[in-house]
Amino acid sequence: YKRQVRAVLSVSPGGREAQWPDQQAVSALAAASPFNTATATALPVFQLPARRPDVIHRLTLAGPAANYAWTINGALYDPRRGAVRQGQRVRLVFDNRSGMFHPMHLHGHTFQVLTDGSRQGPRKDTVLVPPHASVAVDFDADNPGQWLSHCHNVYHGEAGMMTVISYVD
């Protein structure tokens, strides 16, 4: 795939000329491998306390269908709400069955990415799910409401790849 590298240049009227970044450093960045969450971890202060999940929601990502539909669990905007209760540890398993990357986002919470299936990785609100791969994340249900989870490739979300996590009594 093609990689783009951008540099931010700060210039003010009458100031010194912009300093271009070191071309060797830019070339090294452009040739680097994509970020791998298996090697990243959160600082201990940001990790969720170790605990088994109380509920697991599997979100199967698929598409595009003949009409360019992107789905979660076989539905456009999956009407089956992912039910959670206040205080639960919730695991979302994003199972990508498509040939594209999907940056999956959850509103209202941050989650702990699980690497190697169980080791606590980085703390995020969006995780990149590679083609034909699964990524599991855990979050604590501590912000009641109805929270959208969707693909951050906007055209995938608009074409149906979204669902709602709902707190129930």
PLM region spans:
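Beta-strand signatures of extracellular beta-sandwich domains
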Residues: P103-H105
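Extended terminal and domain-junction accessory segments
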Residues: K2-V93, S98-F101, D140-Q146, N153-D169
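Extracytoplasmic beta-sandwich strand-turn segments characteristic of Greek-key/jelly-roll folds
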Residues: L76-A83, G108-P144
